């Protein structure tokens, strides 16, 4: 299992510095008003929301889509992530907790979890079959859900 440590850049910030196995230093910077972000790992990747009304995002590098994510049901915390290399899902581990499971073929292969209930610090633990940038993309989708919950 690879472990990535996600540390907010400030006390009330949703932006992150990410470090850990196979990831020397990465950063995740969120758009203030939209569900979009930029991943630096060390190359730059954009996370773009494809539609205002549907839960669809793309991971883009140099105008090339590397992966896409879809939230098929707005009432669940589940996203399907598709790329040329791997296909997997993230799903809320428990309706009362912020943690997400990373699933491949309906089998858990990792988790995205806050350090404790009152922090934005988090860890990503995942099988190395999923590339680091896709692990961070999955984390980005989890943070979008956390931000929506914090606003509501």
Question: Could you tell me what each predicted segment is?
Answer:
Residues 1-152:
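Intrinsically disordered, low-complexity proline/glycine-rich segments
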């Amino acid at each position: 299992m690879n472990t990535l440590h996600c540390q907010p850049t400030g006390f009330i910030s949703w932006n992150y510095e990410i470090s850990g196995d196979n990831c020397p230093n990465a950063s995740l910077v969120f758009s203030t008003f939209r569900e979009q972000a930029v991943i630096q790992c060390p190359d730059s990747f954009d996370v773009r929301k494809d539609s205002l009304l549907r839960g669809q995002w793309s991971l883009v590098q140099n105008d090339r889509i590397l992966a896409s994510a879809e939230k098929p049901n707005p009432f669940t915390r589940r996203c399907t992530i598709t790329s040329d290399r791997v296909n997997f899902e993230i799903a809320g581990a428990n309706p009362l907790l912020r943690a997400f499971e990373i699933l491949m073929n309906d089998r858990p292969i990792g988790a995205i979890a806050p350090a404790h209930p009152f922090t934005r610090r988090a860890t990503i633990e995942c099988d190395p079959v999923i590339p680091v940038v896709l692990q961070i993309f999955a984390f980005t989708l989890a943070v979008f859900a956390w931000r929506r919950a914090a606003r509501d």
